[in-house]
């Protein structure tokens, strides 16, 4: 039985130059593991709370309080416990914090410990993390949802939609899907250059040109796909993360593309997009608390496209359960730092899958070289992963880990492909 012997933590930098928490654990059998915690640019109101210092250092974004929480409170509480009892460890962390939103110790402190313990336990057992968490049947490689054009909170442009993604659903393997997506990414750069548009990068490695709006961005990407010789729709489909909470207010509704719109008008806009483009997924099309709008939208177009709840659900089993009961959305975005422990993350995924909801594993805009989510995507069989463009090493690290996993699985590996999107029809309605 592997026993926790040492727990340490430090302040490191994420991909946006902001401090974050890194945790290291050592077991009595000599096993050592570390985990680093990501953070988001557009965060949901209902997410677990990151503990920041709020002082002069790093503009108030330092995390020494969270680091000290690990060293002074968490470490003494879990040293001597068995590392292979993840649920027990995570429950001990929740009990120690004692708040519903993890605001006392900080979700960044708690998650770092939770993930580091899991990685150490896997290594102690002689198993890859995906195998340790997913068991002997974990073998599905996810479709990479590659954010190749950035807007919203991820870029300093006038484009309201936060992410424009390509999904290489027609590829025969993850390795080929990565190649296809990467070739489209480079093709898009050429298309942008030819049109005199910026090829500067946003937070997640995608290009951040200042284009006229959603349709203009989708047209650029469609052109880039076709320029590679791949088929738009059959080979490479499109997806959006609207992040609608970012442009919603109770007073004005949705301030989108220089117009004030209602939830119904936003729904009509999405229906038009579905008629015109091969969209497989739309994330956060409405605000995080617009439950009635979500239900109406799901009823209207949920049989045609994946509707993903990110800010709506914040990887929280309780909010997900409410959404399932109401009939809001049909997929869950999974971000481990939104909820703050591995156990709660796995519980949310289990609830989603048992209720017929799809899941998409996701990074954050402030990332590190940690590759846990790549293993987690395979472990839970999500069939989809969102971890940015094929650029910037903190994004590529996850893709490279998935290449290793596919190679490890050998003939047992299966690429999710278009089966990850059962609601999608290759040909647009009109």
From Swiss-Prot:
Q: Which UniProt keywords apply?
A: Cytoplasm, Glycolysis, Lyase, Magnesium, Metal-binding, Secreted
Cofactor details (free text): Binds a second Mg(2+) ion via substrate during catalysis.
Would the keyword Repeat be found if you checked this record's keyword annotation? Answer: no
Fetch the CDD domains from UniProt.
Answer: enolase
Entries under InterPro entries matching the protein: Enolase, Enolase-like_C_sf, Enolase-like_N, Enolase_C, Enolase_CS, Enolase_N
List cofactor names only.
Mg(2+)
Q: In which pathway does it act?
A: Carbohydrate degradation; glycolysis; pyruvate from D-glyceraldehyde 3-phosphate: step 4/5
- Pfam families annotated for this entry? Enolase_C, Enolase_N
Q: Tell me which residues bind Mg(2+).
A: 241, 283, 310
Highest taxon, organism lineage: Bacteria
GO CC, one annotated term: extracellular region
Localization recorded for this chain is:
Cytoplasm; Secreted; Cell surface
- Supply the enzyme class, top level: lyase
NCBIfam families named among the record's database cross-references: eno
Q: What does this protein do?
A: Catalyzes the reversible conversion of 2-phosphoglycerate (2-PG) into phosphoenolpyruvate (PEP). It is essential for the degradation of carbohydrates via glycolysis.
What family, per the record?
A: Belongs to the enolase family.
**Protein name in UniProt:** Enolase
Question: What is the organism field in this record?
Answer: Mycobacteroides abscessus (strain ATCC 19977 / DSM 44196 / CCUG 20993 / CIP 104536 / JCM 13569 / NCTC 13031 / TMC 1543 / L948)
What lineage is this protein's organism placed in? Bacteria, Bacillati, Actinomycetota, Actinomycetes, Mycobacteriales
Gene symbol here is eno
């Amino acid at each position: 039985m592997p026993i926790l012997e040492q727990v340490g933590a430090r302040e490191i930098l994420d991909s946006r130059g902001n401090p974050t928490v890194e945790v290291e654990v050592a077991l009595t059998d000599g096993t050592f593991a570390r985990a680093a915690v990501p953070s988001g640019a557009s965060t949901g109101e209902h997410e677990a709370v990151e503990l920041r210092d709020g002082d002069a250092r790093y503009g108030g974004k330092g995390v020494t309080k969270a680091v000290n929480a690990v060293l002074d409170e968490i470490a003494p509480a879990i040293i001597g416990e068995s590392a292979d009892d993840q649920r027990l460890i995570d429950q001990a962390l929740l009990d120690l914090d004692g708040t519903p939103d993890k605001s006392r110790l900080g979700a960044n402190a708690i998650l770092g410990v939770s993930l580091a313990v899991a990685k150490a336990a896997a290594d102690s057992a002689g198993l890859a993390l995906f195998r340790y968490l997913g068991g002997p049947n974990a073998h599905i490689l996810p479709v990479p949802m590659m954010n190749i054009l950035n807007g919203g909170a991820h870029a300093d442009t006038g484009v309201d939609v936060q992410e424009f993604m390509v999904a290489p659903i027609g590829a025969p393997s993850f390795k080929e899907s990565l190649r296809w997506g990467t070739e489209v990414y480079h093709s898009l750069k050429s298309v942008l250059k030819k049109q005199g548009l910026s090829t500067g990068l946003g937070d997640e490695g995608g290009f951040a040109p200042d284009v006229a709006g959603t349709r203009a961005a989708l047209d650029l990407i469609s052109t880039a796909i076709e320029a590679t010789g791949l088929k738009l729709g059959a080979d490479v489909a499109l997806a959006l993360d609207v992040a609608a909470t970012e442009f919603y207010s109770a007073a004005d509704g949705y301030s989108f593309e220089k117009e004030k719109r209602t939830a119904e008008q936003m729904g009509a806009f999405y229906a038009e997009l579905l008629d015109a483009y091969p969209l497989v997924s739309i994330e956060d099309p409405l605000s995080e608390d617009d439950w009635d709008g979500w239900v109406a939208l799901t009823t209207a177009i949920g049989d045609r496209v994946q509707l993903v709840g990110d800010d709506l659900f914040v990887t929280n089993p309780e909010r997900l359960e409410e959404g399932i009961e109401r009939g809001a959305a049909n997929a869950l975005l999974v971000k481990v730092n939104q909820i703050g422990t591995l156990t709660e993350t796995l519980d949310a995924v289990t609830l989603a899958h048992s209720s017929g909801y799809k899941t998409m594993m996701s990074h954050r805009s402030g990332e590190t070289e940690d590759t846990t989510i790549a293993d987690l995507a395979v472990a839970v069989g999500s069939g989809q992963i969102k971890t940015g463009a094929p650029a910037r090493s903190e994004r590529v690290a996850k893709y490279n880990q998935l290449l290793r996993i596919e190679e490890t699985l050998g003939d047992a590996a299966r690429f999710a492909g278009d089966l990850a999107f059962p609601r999608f029809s290759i040909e647009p309605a009109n």
